[in-house]
């Protein structure tokens, strides 16, 4: 049962799709953990308290300090693209170790095909911090869906679909487009 991996559907829904799975496999490789021995339970332990919904999984894999940290959206976006495009060859090194840790902490739980991150944004200052755990006052938490820089402007298209849903009377979480480093991304409030 490939879809649910032997788990009840409501729990299997916490497992990430292509993007989060790419990060998980790269993390396993860099942690010298053979993927062939990993079970869905191990994967849920990696997700821990960073699942998209209300569920948390214990014991959680320790991914380091869980306090919020500043996020350089453009640098993280560039590194996320590298991980997605070169997932079999990108390796943890001295130059990218902090980016790698940040990416795993805020980007490995959201599902879906395209890279995304959980961030918190201060609408007054524009500062972006990690959106996992306790966030500072004055910040709002978002799912930031990176534009994938393909032939289609996915972020802008998703915003158009969001506006169409609002115009049709469908209740949606507030969403917006924001540009970082010349690249426009779609953000939806959590």
Which residues does each PLM region occupy?
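Phosphate/dinucleotide-binding and metal-coordinating scaffold of catalytic cores
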Residues: 1-190
């Amino acid at each position: 049962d490939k879809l649910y991996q032997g788990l009840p559907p409501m729990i299997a829904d916490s497992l990430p799709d292509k993007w989060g799975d790419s990060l998980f496999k790269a993390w396993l490789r860099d942690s010298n953990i053979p993927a062939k021995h990993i079970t869905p339970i191990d994967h849920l332990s990696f997700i821990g308290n960073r699942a998209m919904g209300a569920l948390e999984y214990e014991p959680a894999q320790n991914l380091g300090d869980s306090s919020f940290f500043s996020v350089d959206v453009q640098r993280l976006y560039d590194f996320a693209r590298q991980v997605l495009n070169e997932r079999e060859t990108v390796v943890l090194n001295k130059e990218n170790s902090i980016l790698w840790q940040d990416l795993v902490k805020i980007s490995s739980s959201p599902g879906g095909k395209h890279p995304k991150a959980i961030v918190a944004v201060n609408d007054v200052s524009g500062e972006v911090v990690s959106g996992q755990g306790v966030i500072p006052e004055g910040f709002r938490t978002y799912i930031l869906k990176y534009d994938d820089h393909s032939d289609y402007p996915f972020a802008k298209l998703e915003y158009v679909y969001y506006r169409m849903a609002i115009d049709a009377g469908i209740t949606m979480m507030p969403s917006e487009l924001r540009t970082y480093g010349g690249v426009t991304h779609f953000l939806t409030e959590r």
